Amino acid sequence: MLENKILLLGLGFLGEEICNEALKRNYDVVKTRLHKSDGIIQLDINNHSKVKNLIESQKPEIVINCISRNDIDNLEKNPKLATDVNVTGPKIIAEACEKIGSKLIHISTDSVFDGKNGMYSEDKKPNPINIYARSKLDGENEIKKMCKNYVIVRTNFFGINKFGKYLLNDILTKLKNNEKIQGFKDVIFTPLSTKNLSQQIMDVSFSDYRGILNLSANKPISKLEFCNILANKLNFKNFNIIEESIDNFNFIAKRPKNTSLDNSLSKSIVKHKSVDFEEWLNFSTMEIIQHFNLENNQK
């Protein structure tokens, strides 16, 4: 096993930010992605022998697994897709990590809870209500069985990214085009920015902590509040945010309402404090304006 070497599985939205944070700290990072890309190892999580061989040949001190299927409605119709990537994949990774003594950091989700109560601590019993969430919980359980040295990170996140299909991008695109935005007043979460989350993931990677860990914001926020705070902070004058209840929508997969997490335990483990959404906006406004070409909106 090679000290200070990280194998990062899944260089996507969160993975890229983790990579940046690891490089800032002078770690050696080996990266994988599903599709071919220069300087990045092409890896399909369903190619089990290649996954095992990669981990065993690289001998990293830390393996960070960001690979996941989270297209919730599609997975509800195609549960095998969820099982292959979110259950069997983590099992194979955990087996290989255990064999060579690598520490596994696995990115899970706040959606393992049914959303009836909120502010869930690590010891609360999960109760997934859709195929995606069930597969993520099953993946957690496979890791627990296969591997001793692991951290399962339950979280939710947002950020500025080039992939264009995530919460912040979706809201800002609609605000810019003056499109209607459905703001759910009863969908509540505790998201971290990808940058803040990556800092905390790196903190815990080289800590002595083992087990499940919530990495989340301090205060819950509804999707409606999230939208309104963003629109007001960026000086949108004529935005069309409609207050809605998720009860009025018939998604293919059920959605939990309040998946907010209690991050009390993490405060004694990570060095970087959790930054709530509104505080994050205070020092990220200019980056958002430039990334989304909102300069005219500021006049």
Tell what function each PLM region has.
Residues 200, 207-252, 257, 292-297:
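Mid/C-terminal beta-alpha module of Rossmann-like enzyme folds, strongest
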Residues 77-105:
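NAD(P)-cofactor binding segment of oxidoreductase domains
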Residues 183-188, 213-221, 269:
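Glycine-rich Rossmann NAD(P)(H)-binding loop
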